[in-house]
Amino acid sequence: MSRTKGGTVTHRRHKKVIDAAKGYYGARSTNFRTATQAVDKANQYATRDRKNRKRQFRALWIQRINAAVRQHDEALTYSRFINGLAKAGIEVDRKVLADLAVHEPDAFSAIVDQAKAAL
């Protein structure tokens, strides 16, 4: 039985890494060893930032809700507003509240009034 050479397999593996590093600066886009390191690091960043994205969006929603609540009533804080929502039995998540605050201020004002009445 003849010996199997690994040239095509190695070439495919190298090509996959080099293709993933397309657009990187300098040798990182052409040199297999540095491209491998760059792609590995990029994947680490991507994995980490998929988790961070969720935190960042939640923080953004909270900031938007807080700003809209304070525009409506300066004495009311985000914390007291959320407490009022819970007491009023209004189950709307922060994403929807932030969207309402930005795109439909009248509907958001009605929710704020209900939450304030429940306090």
UniProtKB/Swiss-Prot annotation:
It holds the Pfam family Ribosomal_L20. InterPro entries: Ribosomal_bL20 (IPR005813), RIBOSOMAL_L20_CS (IPR049946), Ribosomal_protein_bL20_C (IPR035566). Keywords: Ribonucleoprotein, Ribosomal protein, RNA-binding, rRNA-binding. One of its GO terms (cellular component) is ribonucleoprotein complex. The keyword Ribonucleoprotein applies. GO terms for biological process: ribosomal large subunit assembly; translation. One of its GO terms (molecular function) is structural constituent of ribosome. NCBIfam families: rplT_bact. Belongs to the bacterial ribosomal protein bL20 family. Binds directly to 23S ribosomal RNA and is necessary for the in vitro assembly process of the 50S ribosomal subunit. It is not involved in the protein synthesizing functions of that subunit. This is Large ribosomal subunit protein bL20. It comes from Jannaschia sp. (strain CCS1). The gene is rplT.
